[in-house]
Amino acid sequence: PPSQATTGAWRITVPEWCRDQRNQMTGPADDAELVVKMLNSGAPGVMLDLEDSMANAWPNLMRGVANIQAALTGTLTYEDAKRGRTVGISTSQVAIWSRVRGLHLSQAGVIPGEITSASLFDLALLVHPLDAASLKHPFAVYIPKSESAEEARWWADVFKAIAAAKGWPSDFIRCMALVESHPLAYQMEEFLHELRDHIVGLNLGRWDYMASLIHWNLRDPHWVLPDRNTIPHDVPFFQRLRHLLVDICHRRGALAIGGMTALYPSRTDAELNARALATLEKDKRNEAACFMDGAWTGHPDQNAIAVAQFPEPNQLHARLPDVERYPDLRPAPIGVGSITLGGTRAAVRTVIRYRNGVLHGRGASLLDGYMEDLATDRIYRLMIAQRLLHRDHLAIVDGDGHPMVHDDALVARGFDEALTMLVAELPIGRDPGDEDTLHEAARQSRLMIENGFCDPI
């Protein structure tokens, strides 16, 4: 309904230090070498992640927080064993964004017998030792997994309370927020309004958003997701949201940032490298044509190509003509991609390998050329669950084009076959526990699918 948020004349002011965000490079904060390389990559923005690309474990969190604090003060280093030297952060104006864990997660063990908001705990850990005078980069936060404008009000209150406790100006903490849940797509303007003293932009977190779309359409037999890697980046359920996000952000003076291109370049496979960079260029060119102001990447070799697709530091002055104010944001993916047994098999193999990485302390893993984190795991778990729900009238085919029934037996067989192959692929001389960990990864993944776990865990 109309409100001050949607009808008022309010505007957001983007500070000079972050007006150019044509590429934001992202990666887990607990890897000091990766953090230094991202900060030295030349990307105008870097997002240091305590959330989906980092396994949610206490040692990782402590390393990640320490690395972010050292990055903000310009003191972070790592030891380059190959060259026998210490590598630090080059002096630059790169904007550093710290992604804390979302409000869907809690932290135990802080207060005896109680649980604490993981978001609040991460923020408190980060800012407690920080002295504003020692910061080489402004303190800025990436907000994940929000579902409503009410959450934005909570974040605004927290930012102001922290600033008051630290003796900082009330608007000292700046932020961007990810639109990666379907409900938030309907409250983007209200979300910006609640955080207008702090927020500088919104980001389309498209892989988590895809998972959220499956979740919200899980029981709709007319809304079944095709194989993920057959879905084009400009599929209507993404493109309509891109157009709306840009229109709202630019009307209010905020940046609009595009999503991650998951296919990574390779320095050892020329064919994969060429395909990955061509995919990147096409993807970012589409986002630039929608008048987005930048996008995400995760590999240094992607930076120059990503930046080159955006014609100027930002496109805040530009808006697409005739953008619907209330578009259909849930168009069914009909006539898009394909639904195949191969897609289910790829999903099964990926969720096992991803969960195996988590059990080894890795929140993101390079799998078959794609950098996969929790968002991919969610998509594939939900995709398999959705195909099981609609097995009776789902047109799914095998590699020879023959129709299949996507039932529990097919999925169980897929897990057994994938597990056998993954165990066979383990290297000679492996750790004796590696096979057991793979079995545990498969067990956990199957249990999540069977129990319909949809939340980002």
PLM features: what roles do these ranges have?
Residues 1-19:
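Flexible inter-domain linker/hinge segments
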Residues 2-8, 25-30, 37-39, 47, ...:
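Conserved alpha/beta-domain cores
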Residues 16-23, 93:
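A short, charged/proline- and glycine-enriched loop
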Residues 42:
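Conserved functional loop/turn residues at catalytic and ligand-binding sites
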Residues 58, 62-74:
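Active-site-surrounding "flap" and adjacent substrate/cofactor-binding loops of secreted or lumenal enzymes
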